[in-house]
Amino acid sequence: MTKTIDFYFDFISPFSYLAQVKLPDLARRTGCVIEYRPIDIPEAKIAAGNYGPSNREVVPKIKVMMADLERWAAKYEVPLTFPASFACSDWNCAALYARGQDQAEAFVTAAYHRIWGIGIDPRDQNELRGCAEDVGLDADALCEFVRSPAGQGEYRKARTQAYQRGVFGAPMMFVDDQIFWGNDRLDFLESYLLD
């Protein structure tokens, strides 16, 4: 029976970007499928009872995180450029549209490349439209979904279900009753899937 990796991510997360760099190949090697599940990290933290400051507000922590991000990007041989803003909600919602069109992997990969590889401004709707078009999605339909009450409702429902499941950050990968948090847990995930 094919196992499913529930991949909880937020385009605001550079560590989710790094996980997405490796996750599709990992899934193919292990015969799994990925279910892409966008969340909102600040909202997830609060839902889990974490009311502390964001990582960007803790100066010693952000210095270490920045160094780690550079190391991971070099290890994975991918570009890493901080985006012009962290307003990624529309992109998260758009991932649900892409999932409904069986284009989640392509869209998420292309979106992460734009946001964290190139460093675009996620607030720029032309970037969102361009990303949709690059992977063969109808940009008008995607943007309409993102703006619609139905699309926003689907995104809200997806987030609520994630938090009820215990999602408190990203990236998080769930398989069976196992949880793997962070791109640095991909080896553990692969070992579990191969056992």
UniProtKB/Swiss-Prot annotation:
Active site (catalytic residues): S13 (nucleophile)
Keyword Isomerase among UniProt keywords: yes
Coiled coil: none
Thylakoid is among the record's keywords: no
InterPro entries, A to Z: DSBA-like_thioredoxin_dom, GST_Kappa/NadH, HCCAis_GSTk, NahD-like, Thioredoxin-like_sf
Native source organism of the sequence: Sphingobium xenophagum
Residues binding substrate, per UniProt: K45, N55, R56
Highest taxon, organism lineage: Bacteria
Residues that bind glutathione: S13, W181, G182, N183, D184
Pfam families in the cross-refs: DSBA
Keywords: Aromatic hydrocarbons catabolism, Isomerase
EC class of the enzyme, as a word: isomerase
EC number: 5.99.1.4
Lineage of source species: Bacteria, Pseudomonadati, Pseudomonadota, Alphaproteobacteria, Sphingomonadales
Catalyses which reaction(s): 2-hydroxychromene-2-carboxylate = (3E)-4-(2-hydroxyphenyl)-2-oxobut-3-enoate
The protein, known as: 2-hydroxychromene-2-carboxylate isomerase
Gene Ontology molecular function: any one: glutathione peroxidase activity
Regulation: Activated by salicylate.
Task of the protein: Involved in the naphthalene and naphthalenesulfonate catabolic pathway. Catalyzes the reversible glutathione-dependent isomerization of 2-hydroxychromene-2-carboxylate (HCCA) to trans-O-hydroxybenzylidenepyruvate (THBPA). It can also use 2-hydroxybenzo[g]chromene-2-carboxylate as substrate.
Assigned protein family: Belongs to the GST superfamily. NadH family.
